[in-house]
Design a protein with these regions (language model features):
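Short, polar N-cap/turn motifs at the start of nucleic acid-interacting alpha helices
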Residues: 59-66, 147-148, 167-186, 197
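Basic, Lys/Arg- and aromatic-enriched nucleic-acid-binding interface segment
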Residues: 1-55, 63, 87-88, 97-100, ...
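C-terminal secondary-structure termini that scaffold catalytic or DNA-interacting sites
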Residues: 64, 75-100, 104, 108, ...
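C-terminal catalytic core of tyrosine-transesterase DNA break-rejoin enzymes
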Residues: 33, 37-40, 44-51, 131, ...
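Residue-level detector of conserved, well-ordered beta-strand and adjacent loop positions
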Residues: 5, 20, 28, 70, ...
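Residue-level signal for well-ordered alpha-helical positions
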Residues: 30, 55, 104-108, 187-190
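Active-site/catalytic core of tyrosine-dependent DNA strand-transfer enzymes
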Residues: 22, 64, 73-75, 95-147
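Short, small-residue-rich loop/turn micro-motifs
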Residues: 2-8, 71-73, 176, 191
Length: 215
């Protein structure tokens, strides 16, 4: 482990887990829906789980192949609130093959008064992240021999896959929506087409997952 110093406080940090395509494919095979589709959304968009759980169908434009991230589920009280910063609020590209997975899920998704993409079967609202991680994702990771697979694993995997496909740092930052003003100023704003191209390459890596989801 490495020692990380933050304003006079030292703490140990674990190296983040990065999954291979093969590991992701096996992991989602252990997950029932809707959790399997949630994980696929995370891997194919890099969205935070708080943003995924707060997704509404009205924010997804299947004609333009875009998804607007505006709100999240707050961890403290599980209520819906705006995303943390202006950098977190953005329009993201969605790949056509990934869009087909979303459309297939929409057909079998239970109807929801709140227009949720992932409405809870128990409350008619959105799901809570922690129980899903503890009851489904972490046990699935342990079957792969990985002890600490969690929601952030998929976001970190997405970032690593972006890097592996050669996506420029500025484009990565816009897709992940990090609030790093210095990096934004240094690399400039990424155009939607640049973001779409970078995202497309990651989704191509994840194609086996999408094919399994549609099987």
């Amino acid at each position: 482990m490495d020692l990380v110093t933050i304003k006079g406080v030292s703490k140990r940090s674990k190296k983040p887990i990065v999954l291979t395509v093969e590991q992701c494919l096996i992991l989602i095979s252990f997950l029932p829906d809707p959790y399997r589709t949630m994980v696929i959304v995370s891997i194919c968009t890099g969205c935070r789980v708080s943003e995924i759980l707060a997704l509404r169908w009205s924010r997804i434009d299947f004609d333009k192949l875009t998804m607007m991230v505006k709100v999240k589920v707050k961890a403290v009280n599980e209520r819906i609130g705006r995303v943390k910063t202006e950098y977190s609020e953005d329009e993201l590209p969605i790949d056509p093959q990934f869009a087909r997975v979303l459309k297939a899920w929409k057909k079998k998704c239970p109807s929801s008064p709140g227009d949720w993409v992932f409405p809870s079967a128990f409350t008619d609202r959105c799901y809570h992240a922690s129980p899903i991680q503890q009851d489904y994702i972490r046990p699935a990771g342990k079957k792969l021999g990985l002890e600490s697979v969690g929601w952030h694993t998929f976001r970190h995997t997405y970032r690593t896959w972006l890097d592996a496909t050669g996506a420029p740092v500025g484009v990565q930052q816009k897709l992940l929506r990090h609030a790093d003003v210095g990096t934004t100023m240094k690399y400039g704003n990424a155009l939607m087409e640049s973001k779409r191209d970078a995202n497309r390459k990651v989704v191509r890596m994840a194609r086996p997952l999408l094919q399994q989801a549609q099987a």
